[in-house]
Structure formats: structure tokens, C-alpha cells
Amino acid sequence: MIDNILQFFLKNVPQDKTYEINNLQDANHLIIRNTRTGTRRLFEYVNNFQQFLNTIRNNFNGPCAKHDMGASCEDTEEPAEKHAAQTLDGHDWVLESNDFCIFVKPFILKKHYDIIQKYINFEDFFKSTDPGYINKCVQAGDYYYWPNWPKKQAFSFNGWQLFLNIKFGIVIEPTIPIIHNKKLGPVDLFVFDPKCFLNVELSLRTNHDPPQTLFVNGKTKFDDSHEDLFILKMADGTVATCKVNGELVNSDKNFFNYIRDDINLEECITVPKYKHIVNVNLKSLRVFENNNFDKNDVDLSDTRSRKPRIVPIISASSENADYIQTQINLGLIAIHENMVKVLATHERANDPNLLQQYFEKSKFKNFDFLIYVLWKILTKNENFSYRETDIKLFLELLCESLFACDKEALNEALKRCEPYKKQEKIVFNRACNHWFDFDDTKLCVSLGYYFGIHYMIYLTQSAKNEILDHDELWAYTYENVMALNLPPDIVCKGFFRKLENVVTGVNLVFNGKHYQIVKKEDDLFKLTKSNCYKLSNIKFNNWKYLYLTTHGVYNVFTNSFHSSCPFLLGTTLPQTFKKPTDEKYLPEDAFNYMLSTSADELSIYRTYHIAKMCRDVKMLKTNTAIVNYMGNCNTCQADMRVALNNLFRDLWNLDDENLITLALYVNKNRVSDMLHNLKCKPCRSTVSGSRPKCKCYKKIKINRKALKVCLMADMFGNDAELSELIWMLIFTNKTYVSTTLIRTNSEFVNQHGEFFSKEHNKIIQYLYRTIHKIEYVDMLMDKFNDKRLFLTELRDDVAREPDVQFEESDNISKFYTHHADALMILKKYNVWWDKIILARSTDDLPTWLTRFYMRIIMSKVDLKEYSYNYLKKIVEGYLYFKRFTNFNHANAIMLMHFAASLAIPVDYGKKAIYMPGEPGSGKSSFFELLDYLVLMHKFDDDNHSGESNKETSDKEVSKLNSQLYTINELKQCSESYFKKHADSSKSDSKSRKYQGLLKYEANYKMLIVNNKPLYVDDYDDGVQDRFLIVYTNHKFVDSVKFAGSVYEHIKSKQFPIESMYYESLVTPVRLFLSHVLMYRRDPKTGFVVYKTLLSNDPMHKHNLMCLSTNNSPLYALIYILNIKTVRSATITIGEDKMEEMIGIAVQHFKNFLHPSFVQYNYKKNINASSSKSFVFNEQVLLQQIKNKFKNNYNKTTNVFYNMTMALNRNDLNTSVPNFVC
């Protein structure tokens, strides 16, 4: 019975290389074989095979296994056996192994069981209250199997084959009998999506010295004594070997998934000994074979290769060259002399190349400090003027003066100078001015002491312990400095600097990390008692490009670290995105490519989604056939019917752009026919295609209704002849129809072709209406199944159809544009032919999205030198910003740059990020994530008037020391408060409890997060100019599951919540932002620019207008009256008319203005009437309009000119604008 049914919906496959057994070529295809007849049938989707097993489990007897409410919930097979044994005749079908998706309960033929039964013990992998329970083995037909495994635990079938072969020399068939097989009985051996599975132990390592481990699933230390299983070739030419250990391990790590997904692995070769068990074809696993899509159907504008990036190199020159060289020489001599003082007791003190040796041995860690000090000495001369060429000459002369005799060291020094050569002179000078000049000691003296102490630490550490690594040898710490027992004067001037504020009496000492307030009884105070530097006005944390961190001094220009030093005055340790242990940066071109493709991403996801929907149709049609023809489960049949119908409705309701993309996927040859046959007659007759200057193809119009009918017939019908007839509805020219009828070999098409041509419009209208109104799509499929009855009924119904003429609105007028756009995406990105991007049953959204991006975007750039996991982390960080903004390109790019700018501790933007949005859209998670990465001060208060709700002194100091100031759920604030915190000038003097007053340079940037609209009293242009608005209206919802395509979630604006997702993003986001900081700085300022990124974004302009109309009567008035300045306006508007329209517009203010506006202004008693209701003074509003549009107002004639606006009540904008994204 099963044999007869399967032939109707499963493709027959031959025994050739495409479908060769043991050859892993497709992770989704499953082949079943009839051992009696040799027939092989293909399940194109694992989901179809699962549905097949679920349906036949109860052997056509009532509900399926899934919906049988009376079935036992135990993990054993006995209930199924007992129930099915009464009705089963048995079959001969087995499944050929596919280790990507097939896991089993262990089983073995009876003839082999006697060999292994004494040696099998699974209790090492499971705990049970019943000893021996997991090892219980029972007979089923010709087999023995272990039934008592947990539901989500399995055995890799490939691993089971290898285990039996390696341990016992047993070779088992690469097939698994299907439930109700004659030789097995009513036992289901298959396990889908196990949490863990047993496998032989594997280790994949490169053949480098030392080798790099790419994959392991156990803890054995593999060596040459272990057997090889696979040899893998990598993109950079490296060879990796996968070794196998015959012992079992229990893990969730699938080796085949790893090698399939790693874009740096290109070929996998099985060693000859195990070719009979498994072969892996990586190319076939990754790409569909039938991908010969003709992308040259239309001329594409973006066919040129990217031009190489060219950066001009300026030549070094200076009118002050002699002065620069002299100061360099004097400075180097002074630094050398003071280093000698520190190392006086060491034999290295006599080394004439002491400074050079220090730099080389320390790997130039603090070489930049020498640049800063010598430049500060140069610029102290008021007669010294300079430009970029002078700076370049200074850097080159400095390197040459130090390393003239050492070419390798010279090249390294010049390399260290490269970042500074890219900066403008103001930026370079600003960086050097970070170095504080303690005028009680000459700059070269203190730097010489600093270098000398550092070198002495190295010499001491290396003499004591030879096994320390480089960083440990050069660790510039409090403990290491103290252990040297150097003279106090040297130590205090070179490292432990002490400061005293003579105004407040506060003492601070550099503690090896940052400056801390000390008291007389503290050890640091006593250590520096006689070496105090007194200041009357000292500001801390006044830094931009260099600042103290837990890893040392961070340099924004080089994205690297120097040793901690006392010459940067800081009382806090800001966090940075770079860590000393990070891998090297991706190439700049590769990173910029990531950001540049952001604009294409929605189109990429949309194009993929079209293909995904078509595959789903195919899968659901097969499932529908399975549940209808092979089972009797009403629930399954209803579920499949609804699922297929929902998908049909989604396809039927596609917009024009998506319809054209769908047509390309479903029937690209017909689309090519449209392009050719709907051109003008001269172009159709031209052999080579369109005439060079003819643009007729841009005027091609397609009847939307006809196209929808054709696409549904192709997708939900299975008859080529009927499809050929229906596609004739697209074409109106008789030549095409007659040619089709001549070329066809179908009598059916010839019989009805003239009818379709003659009744063209009627047929379109009738079929469109029929399909549109059909209740369930399976009813349409039934109609298509009997084409002759379908045509008979169609002729009868069309005969009664009235004549119809289609309107212009029935056409897809932008056919060519949509077609060209779709082809452009398909030309650039392999979204329809890559198998790896297909969603897997175990995928969640972040996992799938990362894999998709790695394959479609990152595979297009050369990143062979980088590990797959490192690349994946950077991609995950990038995709976080995309998901958070619902893939809004402009908002995502701006937030990336804003977040990266937090690592530059100065508020240069004068902008506050305002994030209103729906609850559950991820706003809180955004600042919680940033809290892991930077110093964030968060203050929750719904009202900041500037006069109340002030924070405590400790919190004020915390805020001044922070990198990000976040206010959650701020409902109202004053104009003065907002400008104060969003402005760049934020110096302030504050003190912690029981500590003295200190002056700080506040460097935080402001973030406001709200669910409800914010009210700012006295809202004006200054307030408006300080806002960057990112609105979010999507939601992360518990009940939403990953739909297999991110575009589905983008459309619905509902995303699944993944537990612990944000915590796992800390490192990926940090690594990604480190790249933004490295490559996206403005060379003019050295800053990461973010405030102008939304300047031309239409959505941001709209959202800014929404905020303004909600807060300001003036902006509300401008919006309601639709006032616009237009140079060519011919009419003028008198002052009386303006006042009249203001009077009308004011009546709508209550709908536009924030509720807090009236309350606040009534309290201030501005324009308030005795009835305690707020009244707007129309004369005041008129004057505000005059001020706002002063360039369009003639004071002499009292008229407005070059302006358009609503001149009557009906033209007013009375619809309140809402935020959009």
C-alpha cells in the first residue's frame, strides 16, 4: 500500500553520483530505498520525512502519533508495538543515512549483537535511578535495539558506524529501517533535533607548528598514533587533519555542521580506509547545482569592479628643520642622561644606545610618549609655526635620529608614526597636549625617569624569572616600582606623582593606575611627602585621545595601549572596546564593505524570503499529500490545510516589487519572454536585443492580475500544459500567441490557445476573482489537478462573463525597475543558491542570521587569515545593531557610530540620543549592554526641572566620571537641564562625601530612553538641534518563534526573545565597536562622527517634526498651516490673513501639544485665563512666525512672500503626526 502511494508525491531518484549513498551532498535531502525492488524515493525536506514517520506510526489507524491523546508519554516503544502489531502488514523501506539530520537510537542486526553485547555500556553517559535501565537491549524482528534512551538523546548514525567498525571490525549497512519495516516491526529508531548525541571522539587541527585546534568533541590529547579520518583543505592553503578515536563521547557538537559552515574550509577528503562509511562533498553541501541563473537579462549599472582606495602621501618639509633637529637632539640627550640616573647601579647604564634598546625590547610600547614630549618642547617656542608637513618632518627626523643605524627598528618606529601623519595639525597638537607639564621638573627629565624606571623593571624581572611572558616582564605596576628601591625623588617625579589643590587642600597621588585622593595616614601620602606639586586650578579627566584604563593608557589613534603613566591627569578608568589580547583588526576595506552593504540588507533578506516561501509551498504540499493519502488524522489534515492556505495568502498579497522577484524565482524564462516580447516592435526584431538608445523596456507594463494568476498556477498546480496556457494571459500581441501555438507539441495547448487569446481579459478577470475569493488553496489545487474539467468549466463561466477593460492602476508600471533591482541583488549576493543559509530545525534567529551574513556577505571578501570564530563574533556585534533597529539602515549606522564614540571620552557631538518606542523593543537592553562596555551613569527620574531632583554629590561625581549618562523613562525636563547635559562644555566642581572638592571635565554623552513622549518646557530651536531620535516600534515577544527567515519578523515587527542573548553579545559588540573606532574616525578631528549621519534621513526629519509639534506651539502651528518657503511662489500672504489662519489653527492645538504643556504653562501663569484653562495669544504666535520666517517677511508692506501655506480651513493638516521607523 505504501509503495503505491509514495509514487504520487515523492520523486524517483537513480543510483548515480548525485544521489550516491554515503556521499554527504545535501543536508536536507533524505532518500528512502525499497530493499525488495531497489526503488529509491526522495524527500526534499527533513520536515517531510518527519511528517511521514508521524503519519505512518499508527498505520492508518485514527490520529497520528503526535495527536493521539491516548498514546503513552513514556520513552519506551512498547505501546506503539502493542497498538500497531494488530494491523500492520509491513513494508520494505529503509532510510539511507544523512548524518546532518539523522540521529538514531543504537541498533544492530542479531548476527552482530552477540559480538558486542558484553562490551556495550552506556551508563557512563547517563544517570539512572534504576541500574542497568539504560543498557537494556530488546529484540525487534531481525534487530536488537536500546529503547530506554531519553527523548532528546541520540546516537550519531555515522558515529555508530565508525564505533562498530573501529572497535569490533563490524561493517553495518548505511541504512536505517523505517517503522513497520518487515525486518524491524513497529519500532521508531529515529530521533530528531537531539540536545546531545553519542559519537566517536574527533579532533580537527591544522598542520601548523604549533597546530591550531578547530574542532574537538572530547578531551583526549590526540597525537600521531590516532587514525586519520578526514583531510581538509583551507582557503589559505593550510591543510587540517581530523583524527578519530574509537571511544565514545556525548556532546552537542556536530562535526559536519562545523565543516559545512566554516567559510575558510574548501575541501574535505575522507581517507581511503573509511570511504565506505562516509564521503563529504563540501561544494554540493553548500550550493545548489541548478544555479545557472541568467543575470545578464538586462544591462546592470553596477558592473564595474571597485576601484582601489588611494590615499595621497604628503612630503615632509619645514622652514624650521634645523630648529626641529636641534630640539630633537637635545631632548634625546636629556632623556638618555636621566635614564642613566635611574639605572646607575646597573651595568646597562653605560650603554650608549640605552633609549634605543628600551624601545626595541619593549616593542615600542611607550614610543608615542617621546613624540608628545618633544613636540610640546617644540611648540613652547612662540615663534614656531607649523603645518602638517612640519609634523611629518618632525616624526621622520625623530625616528632617523634614534635608529639611523638600525633599518628594522627605523621601519618599526616610522610605522608607529603613521597614525599621526594622517591627522590634521590641530588634532595632532591636541593629542600631544594630553601630556601634563609639571613645571617643577623639565619634561625630558620626568620622561627620562619614567623610561628608566620601566626599563629597570624589565631588567630586574628578566634576571629573576626567565619564564615570564613579555607583558609580565614589562608590567609597569605599583608593586614592581616599589620593589626596585629607587631614590624617592626619582620615583616620585617619574611615576608616583603627588598633587595638592592649594584652594581646597585636597591631595592626590598617582597609584599606578590613576590619581586617588589620599590622607596623611595613607602609605602613598607618606611615600610622596616631600615631593608635592601644588596647583591652584587643576581639572581632571580632561582627555580626548589618550586616557587611563585598567590595561594602561589607551591611545584612540592607534587603538593600542601604553603603560600607565602619571602625566595624564585622571581620577577614573574609562573602559575601551579594545583589549590587549584581541586578534588583529579586519582589513579596512573588508570592514567598510560590511557597512556599505547595510543599505542592501533589507533587499537581500526580502529576496531570500521569496525563495523561502516557495520552498515552503513545496514542503507543505508534500506534507499535505502525506497526511491526506497516508494517514487519517483530522488534526494534521486541518493544520496542513491552514498552514498552506496562510502561505498562499501571503503570496497572493505580495506587492509589485515582491511579485516580480517571485516571478523570477518561479519561472525566470517567462520573465525573459516578457522583457523581449513587450518591447517595441523595432527592438523585438533586432537580433542583438534593444537598440542602444531605445528605452522602451523602461515603459513595459504587466497586468498585475494576470501575473498573480500565472504565478499561483505554477506554484499550486502541477501541469506543464495548463501552465503554458495560463502564461499566455501575460501577452497581448498576437505574434507571441501564434508563435507559441506553432512551437508547442501539446494538443491541449493548441486546442485552447485561441480561446485564451480571444477571451484574454475575461479569463484574467474571472480567474483572478475566483482565486481571490477561494476559501482554501487546496480547493484551487483540486481544480488544477483535472485540467480538462477545469477548462470545460472555465469556458462555460467565461462565456457568462461581461466584457472588461483594465484600468491603468491594474498594471505594474515599474516592472523594469523592480526586475533590474532584483537582478542586481541576485548578481551581487548568492541568496537563492546557497544551501548553508537555509534555516535548520535547531536554529534560533541569532544563529541563523549570523550564518546567513557570514555566507552571503563575508564570503565575498578575502579573510583567509582570520579564524571563523573571530569573524563570527564581529558579525554578531554588527547584527545586534541591525536587529535592535529592525534593520533600519540609517538608525543602525548612527547607533553604531554613537556607541563607538563612547570610547572617545569627550562629548563633541552636542547631541542627545532620544529613544522613544514601544515597550519590549529592546531599548533597555541597549543601555544594559553598553553598561558592560563603558562607564555608564544611570539615573531614573520622570522629571528633571533643573531646580529639583538633584542627584547626591557622590552620584554627581559618578556622572562626571562616566562615559554615558542614561536617563530611563524621563517624562519631563526643563530646557536648561537638557541643554546643560547635551552640550559639550560640562566642566564642574564636585566632591564625594567626606572628600574635598575637585574640578572635573565631564565627558559623558546623553541617552534618553522612553516609552511615552518626552516633554521639554520652553522648547526652542536650540533644544531641537540637540536631539537625535531613534524610534522603535518592533517587539521582542516570548510567544514568537523563529520563522526561518528574518524578513518575516521585520514585516511583522515581532522578534523572538532568546534567553541570555544580550549577555552573550558583550564581546561581539565590543569587538565590532573597536573596528568602528579604528576605521570610522574623521581625520580632521580624530572623532567618530555620528551627529550628522541622520541629517538627510527623511524618517529622522519626520520624527524630529513630531517631537517639535508635540512640544512647541510654534512648530505645531507651522505643521497645521503647512507653511513652506518656496522661492518661486508668486502670491503673497498678508499679515491679516496669517492672523486669521492662526486663529483657526489654534483650535487644534489640544490634539497636538503634550498634556504637560498646558499644566506647566498654567503654573507659570503665561497667557492663563481666570478659568484656569490655557489660552494661546494669537499675537504672540504671529510674532513668533514673523521671527521664524524673517527672511520671508516684508516689514514695510506687512506681507509674507516666497511662502506657501493653507489659506482655508479645508487645507489644514489636522492629522497628528506619529513617530515612524
Curated annotation (Swiss-Prot):
Enzyme Commission number(s) from the entry: 3.6.4.12
GO biological process entries: DNA replication; viral genome replication
Broad class of enzyme this protein falls into: hydrolase
Short motif Nuclear localization signal, span: 692-701
This protein's GO CC annotations: nuclear viral factory
Highest rank taxon of the organism: Viruses
Localization per record: Host nucleus
This protein's UniProt keywords: ATP-binding, DNA replication, DNA-binding, Early protein, Helicase, Host nucleus, Hydrolase, Nucleotide-binding
Nucleotide-binding keyword on record: yes
Major place of residence: host cell
Positions of the DNA-binding region: 967-981
Binding-site list for ATP: G917, E918, P919, G920, S921, G922, K923, S924
Catalytic activity from the UniProt record: ATP + H2O = ADP + phosphate + H(+)
Main function: Essential for initiation of viral DNA replication, it may contribute to other functions such as controlling the switch to the late phase and leading to the inhibition of host protein synthesis. Required for late and very late gene expression.
Protein name (record): DNA replication helicase
Species annotation: Autographa californica nuclear polyhedrosis virus (AcMNPV)
UniProt gene name: HELI
